[in-house]
Amino acid sequence: MARLERDGTNKSLESLMDSHKPGGTTTNLNQLRTQKSIPGYGLEFTNLSYSIIKKQKKDGVWINKETYLLHDISGQAIKGEIMAIMGPSGAGKSTFLDALAGRIAKGSLQGSVRIDGKPVTTSYMKMVSSYVMQDDQLFPMLTVFETFMFAAEVRLPPSISRDEKKKRVHELLNKLGLQSATHTYIGDEGRRGVSGGERRRVSIGIEIIHKPSLLFLDEPTSGLDSTSAYSVVEKIKDIAQGGSIVLMTIHQPSFRIQMLLDKITILARGRLIYMGRPDALHTHLSGFGRPVPDGENNIEYLLDVITEYDQATVGLDPLVQYQHDGHKPDPAAMTPVPKPPRTPYRRNTPASKHMISLRSQGFTAGTPQPDSSQFGLDDDDNDDDENFDNSLERRSVQTSRNIVTSGVYPRLASQFYQDFSAKDFSVWLYNGVVGTPRRPPSWTPARTPGWTPGKTPLSGPRSFVSNQHSASYQDPYYIQKTNTVVGQSMDYSATSYAPSYEEFEIEEVLDEPDLGPKYANPWLREVAVLSWRTVLNVIRTPELFASREIVLTVMALVLSTIFKNLGDTTFIDINRLLNFYIFAVCLVFFSSNDAVPSFIMERFIFIRETSHNAYRASSYVISSLIVYLPFFAVQGLTFAVITKLMLHLKSNLFNFWMILFASLITTNAYVMLVSALVPSYITGYAVVIATTALFFLTCGFFLKRTQIPAYWKWLHYISAIKYPFEGLLINEFKNNRGCYSGNKADLSPGPLGDVKPSKHHNASLPLNCLLGEDVLSTMDITMESLWYDILILLAWGVLYRFFFYLVLRFYSKNERK
């Protein structure tokens, strides 16, 4: 029931599927845009900062340096609008998008992200949002319709009938303009398929089939021509107008695309330079003192200004400070002084700094040079010689530490709260929605009277207080900034509160509502749907298993013609049997290596699909095993039948096949585990070959168990080749009362070596006679039944599959550390 309630509330968002219906909320959304956004509504982010530790060489010594990729970014994105994130290369656009989407590991991201005034957990963000990656990770052998149907099957609950899912898929195809490509394969380098623009729209479609409340897109126009790029953004605009919150990164949008954007966020070195409407950027730059020249594009001109300041001694601080509080910089700062060129032989000594100061005064034509302390620049923090990336270094760890210990937290951008200075009621409302320091749990925002636990924050009714305030609130992003905002009524820098990550986590635990099931479908249904897709891929990629079947068939024929008749009972045939069986096991092992590149290519699709709870990792592991089992059975049976009949083996055919079948299952599980751990198929091949060599060396063929040094004997017991090799020998020689005869000289050289008679050997046997048990005793095989070997082999296969699941579940996550 909880899931159905959540699905019902998502429908109230007037998403893409319902935006065209009469009586929808398009008019209401337009009214909201005219009434402006309010705190406690939409997606709010406060003081987002993210840093990493980088090793840098300074004065010949490697040191750890904290580098900020995001620094103190605050703002809001509301329903029905597109927020485009822009900036120069390395500005932190994708990092910022990942921070909002919950793709940064816990403990690394500072600040808070809220939806409708409620703090969000990573699991909740996955349930209400979708993320379209920059690379289109799709199965090339599926058609567009099949790709959408799979997304509908795993993203929509079973309460929705299959006919309804098909109807929704066709509606989505029409909305995205993919009607003509409905039954076209996605395609790849080897098979022609949809175009680049259509492929991008398919990637967007599979992420919105379940009508998410938030949609994140990383460079959706990358690699597309201008017409295709405009078409993609136009469809994204339709999605936003359906009631979703859309945030996307974009690089150098055309003028037509800029006209489709509702709000832009421009970053540089992880710092916020501008957030607001595109048509207000001209006023923003004029207020800063850098009006846009006639004929210039506003965004491109701002990027040029950013580059100019970034390469100057003053840095980006004037731009950041003006965006933060509307403080117009000193006139000297509006003409940035270029940095002197760096050379390997020149350091920033005090004398050189003095010379730079003199040059700066001359460059500004008599204008007083601003004090470096005005923008937080210290002489001791000039590390430009070592800073070779486009990220922001922490200016002063001690300063931030003093802020925390004093209880004064960094305030929000004035654009976000400047309108709350008019009345004490507004101040109280702001503190009540965003949060005040040290409030008892009973006064947390989640326990305000307007919160209804049965509905998600995005679709539930807003609180009574928020509705009262919405009529008088004015969007700070749409208002021209003035210099009289700060200090009119009170200083919010000492009272505004940005909850720390630890407090944010505690609030989540206390106030998280019942979100219903984490996944849309039960486990068995996920297995069935994933198995259906895997079968389609296997059928349309016959070379994957056909090549392995051909290899095993050809090698079975070759081995049969090389070893000829192995049914004779001479000493020479004993060594020939041992050689044949060890080669058969190794052949089966190496035939599974083709799973390395196939899974590595599929792994990126798995990460994309599971990053927002499309299905469970366990469903994926089990479904792939179910589909592959019949192919393993056929391959093992083919090899067993050919060699059994042509070589006249005395072994039991069913047991022979079962051992090969179990070997294929286990080796495939092992190769899948390796491919899940390595970054590329080249590394995967290297690891598989190296471990196979160790397994081969310690399986008991070259060195018997008693001949292996004690400190390496553990390798003998974990060898994946040991158990099938022993099982095949037991199947051939166990309970074989026939007598192998010949000269002892025929036993050496060979793998058998010196004979060690078994307990079944007695004096009544002929002089030069060896029983099958004698062969097993000589090979140090003490297992009483081959089924023990089969069970142990399958147990290793289960263990490999379990480790494979753990890697997929906990290691294969698309998040920053």
UniProtKB/Swiss-Prot annotation:
Please give, as recorded in its UniProt entry, the membrane topology of this protein.
Answer: Multi-pass membrane protein
Q: Keywords on this record? A: ATP-binding, Cell membrane, Glycoprotein, Hydrolase, Membrane, Nucleotide-binding, Translocase, Transmembrane, Transmembrane helix, Transport
**Bias (Acidic residues):** 377-388
Q: Which residues lie on this side of the membrane: Cytoplasmic?
A: 1-542, 601-621, 679-681, 809-817
The Gene Ontology terms for molecular function here are: ABC-type transporter activity; ATP binding; ATP hydrolysis activity; ATPase-coupled transmembrane transporter activity
Regions of compositional bias (Polar residues) in chain numbering: 362-375
Q: What is its EC number?
A: 7.6.2.-
Provide the residues annotated with a glycan attachment (glycosylation): 762
In which tissues is this gene expressed?
Answer: Expressed constitutively in the vascular tissue of roots.
List residues of the ABC transporter domain: 43-294
The subunit field of the Swiss-Prot or TrEMBL record says: Heterodimerizes with STR2; the resulting transporter is located in the peri-arbuscular membrane.
For the null mutant, the annotation states:
Stunted arbuscule phenotype due to an impaired arbuscule development during arbuscular mycorrhizal (AM) symbiosis with Glomus versiforme; normal initial phases of the symbiosis, including hyphopodia formation and fungal entry into the cortex, as well as normal arbuscule development initiation, including arbuscule-associated genes expression, but strongly delayed and impaired arbuscule development. Normal nodulation in the presence of Sinorhizobium meliloti.
Its induction, per UniProt? Accumulates in roots cortical cells containing arbuscules, in a RAM1-dependent manner, upon arbuscular mycorrhizal (AM) symbiosis with Glomus versiforme. Triggered by RAM1.
The cross-references to Gene3D superfamilies, in alphabetical order and at most eight, read: P-loop containing nucleotide triphosphate hydrolases (3.40.50.300)
- Principal location class: membrane
Binding site residues for ATP: 87-94
Q: Which biological process annotations from GO are given for this protein?
A: arbuscular mycorrhizal association; response to symbiotic fungus; transmembrane transport
Source organism of the structure: Medicago truncatula (Barrel medic)
Q: Which family does it belong to?
A: Belongs to the ABC transporter superfamily. ABCG family. Stunted arbuscule (STR) subfamily.
- Please list where the region (Disordered) is annotated: 1-30, 321-349, 362-395, 439-463
Tell me the name of the encoding gene.
Answer: STR
The protein here is known as ABC transporter G family member STR
